[in-house]
Amino acid sequence: MVQKKNTLTKTGIVALLACVCCILWGSAIPVIKTGYRLMEVDAADTASQIVFAGIRFTLAGLLVLIFASIRERKVLIPDRTILKYAVPVCLAQTVGQYFFFYIGVAHTSGVKGGIITGLGNFIAILMACLIVRNERMTGRKMAGCVLGFAGVVVINLMGKSLDIGFTLTGEGFILISQVAYGISTILINIYSKKVSPVVLSGTQFTMGGVVLTLIGIGMGGRLGNITAVGVVIIFYLAMVSAVAYTLWSVLLAWNDVSKVAIFGFVNPLCSVILSALILGEVKQAFNTGSLVALLLVCTGIYIVNCKAKQKN
């Protein structure tokens, strides 16, 4: 256990695993769009998108629990303790974050949505330092957050304009989703020290996925044309969620929130670059703006973690 702790707290290992998570999440964006097209889910059909997300997360949770059971060579059934911790995490992360996010995205521009989403990592670090107070806010952490968020702004404003309008169901709901993300990050950081982060992740995904599916169906959502390719896409997205969020939870179990959350600023960069490559929009990803954004984010990550790097 000590060796595991030492390994998972090394800055290089944290950086590698966190970036793997961000690459997986980034690859999900173009795949989700492909899934919408194949299953005839309209861009403005929020209810059907929530059904799609619900099925994805339910399957992701089941996959995590199945793989964990195979690894432990016994069937892992969540007990009362796991359920006690999984319910608040699921309400904050899978249900709260994604319910408000999907509705918000449908009522605002992609530019503003991307920028506000970038605030989630900033909010998580602020909550850890100022509200929960399980770590100390320093000028280094603040500077790293500002630089990381600046990188998100740059990557989202490339060749685009930004209006300053604000609506509750648009920008407001996306902001609420990021507050929910911040809360879930803190909860995972605390609860993963008490129970298995893998079982916690699988349980909360399964519960949250079922709730999202029922909410989407209740709103009139449905998946139209279900094909073999569509099923493969849902399985892939479920694997992305299962692997990425479980890795993220394990990292949060062994490290300060700020040390892990700062890598979340890499996520928008991965989304833009991978979407551009897969969708054939190479010029959009590889230009001066994306390089500046990458430099800002990497500098922010270094500033937050450089002390830890010296210790390790």
Predicted regions and their residues:
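Specific transmembrane alpha-helical segments of multi-pass solute transporters/efflux pumps
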Residues: S69-G113, T117, V154, L237-N255
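Specific alpha-helical transmembrane segments that line the substrate/conduction pathway
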Residues: V51-G54, T58, L62, Q93, ...
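Transmembrane alpha-helical segments that form core, pore/gating elements
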Residues: C22, K33, V64-L65, A124-L126, ...
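Loop-to-transmembrane alpha-helix entry segments
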Residues: T117, R133-V154, I164-G170, A228, ...
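Glycine-/small-residue-enriched transmembrane alpha-helix faces in small-molecule transporters
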Residues: M1-G54, D163-I190, I233-I234, M239, ...
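Juxtamembrane C-cap of transmembrane helices in multi-pass membrane transport proteins
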Residues: L24-A44, L59, Y98-T108, I116, ...
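C-terminal-most transmembrane helix of multi-pass membrane proteins
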Residues: V2-L8, F57, N156-M158, G230, ...
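Transmembrane alpha-helices of multi-pass small-molecule transport proteins
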Residues: D42-Q93, I123-M127, A180-S184, S201-M219, ...
